[in-house]
Amino acid sequence: SIYLRVDWPWAVHNSPLVSMGWHPESGFINSDWKGYDEGMIVYILGLGSPTHPIDPAGWTAWTSTYVWMDYYGKPLVNFPPLFGHQYSHIWIDFRGIQDAYMRGKGIDYFENSRRATLTQRSYAIDNPAQWRDYGPNVWGFTAVDGPHDTTVVIDGRSRQFHTYSARGVAADYVMDDGTLAPTAPGGSVPFAPEIAIPALITMREKYGDNLFTNYGFLDSFNPTFRLPIQPHHGHVVAGVGWFDGDYLGIDQGPIIAMIENYRSDLIWKTMRRNPYVVAGLKKAGFTGGWLGN
């Protein structure tokens, strides 16, 4: 009943794009959902509403802001942090279904997320900035906390570190300060299990209880940050690196949900039966696969 009461057209401030937020004191913020990211599900839900739907032109406007570029030999819709390639996919099974944009590219959004995952690993193997521990099974860049906002010289090289940041790598943007996130490979298990699962296992074995304790993986870690200064939060383990002290639901949820989607399609199967999701996908122009024509 909450979903049926949502006034989606009200949230379309700069038509036909959906606004990212509104404050009672100041009104709409100066940002809309555009450029490929986690906002995909916002448009699907808005389109599928049986009571207050948005105009399908919103989806066309949304896809018109995509950035399609090659990265590490793979053409894809770019978005640097992996969360943008994961969050909508937790709920919606994009395997085998395509909108007009993806039909034009010859892939689906699931394959796009697979490519994004593969390019992150390729970047870590390449390791152009020579951060510690990066490699085939130690990788993962997304929006997480970091150790400190500071610039220091380590082994003769200037290193800039950050606290919270939308870390990520793509053809048009790289934000990398040596901070890695287990939720990045964890949320990509269905897309590329052959690299995501070994990454999780390696992180668990290599860093032990520093990274994986009572409730699973901590938010993030940075093997390069081994400085004798107090981090913004978390702690430094001598000779190993910095480890965050927080468990975040927005980390644990994607790990658990995507592993279960990989195992049993549980969430995907449930959402494929939701008439509003199906309606939203069809209004966005999706066809094929489990949706049919």
Regions inferred by a protein language model and the residue ranges of each:
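Ser/Thr/Asn(+Pro)-rich, low-complexity disordered segments
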Residues: S1-N293
